Amino acid sequence: MILTFYRSGSGHVTLDLPKKDWRTALHDQQGVLWVDFNETQLVEVEPLLRDTFGFHALAIDDTLRQTHVPKIDDWDDHLYAVVHSIIFDAESLAVTTHELDIFLGLNYLVTYHHQPIDAVDWLWRHVGQDRRQFERGPDYLLYLLLDVLTAAYMPAIDALDSALDDLETTVFMQPTPQTLGTIFAVKRAALHLRRIIGPQREVLNKLARDDYAVIDPKDRMFFRDVYDHLVRLVDLNETLRDLTSGSLDIYLSVSSNRINDVMKTLTIISAFFMPISFLVGFFGMNFSALPFNSPWLLAVASGAIVLTPLLMLYWFRQRGWLSSSETRSWKNVTASATMLEASEFRGNREESTQGGNL
């Protein structure tokens, strides 16, 4: 599907401009043309990009392959940029990104994507309701698109942070394989976000600071605002990754500590039965030279069997081997550390939200 929005230099607005009129629109230096290719066949897109718009062959090849991380290329009379939108599944904590290819010229904006992208749909509705946005030029439309696309990343980071908050109690009190699965899901999502928002930050940095012929210097401040948001997102995501790694370390430590407690209990039980087994085996021997027929021998053997575990229990307690205070202390320390890191993350997130509102 191909959508077009054209505002001529005289102010006349045309939707779904026929392809045969695109060249005329491109020659209107005071007009603005936006063409959106959504799930369009490659055989239909390539001739339009090559012949009608005259884009560079390498940029067209990159567009049609759809396998790139965010980047930006300057081809003098137009810019080619690759950015990614985000799709977040709150149940599985899975992050999916869709590539959006953008061409920006002095009087046109071209977008190409295989899947529907919410930011593009929003911009289409927005300019339909307020057509004055076209008066500010295609570079301002690009700013609006990137701003909405970037804002969609914050709910995903908030949801991942909430998932880690829910794990705080579980990871200490009753860690399960499901807990480990959630930790790895958050870790995978944070890693995926890092691979996208890091390069995307550099794209916005170039748009905000470099001199491009197709961007009005007065509009660079808008791209700088989006760049600031991405910087905050990168910082929050790095903190989220650190919290996830810390939660994983704590989970493994708690699990190891529980295994150690179980092994200690089993070892103590085995230690109790070792002298008892020795006594029973000794007095169960069939040597006639030993006074096994003595009437007081039963009382001696029974007393030894009862007293030996009691003496061992007293000795173990004196040595501190049966105390769990060290385990409780370790849990308190690790819990405090995790809560401190989480509070710092929430503080950074609130600052980011407040900065975005400003």
Q: Predicted regions span which residues?
A:
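Peripheral, non-transmembrane regulatory/ligand-interaction domains of membrane transport proteins
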Residues: 1-216, 221-225, 229-232, 239, ...
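Hydrophobic alpha-helical transmembrane segments and their immediately adjacent juxtamembrane loops
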Residues: 228-358
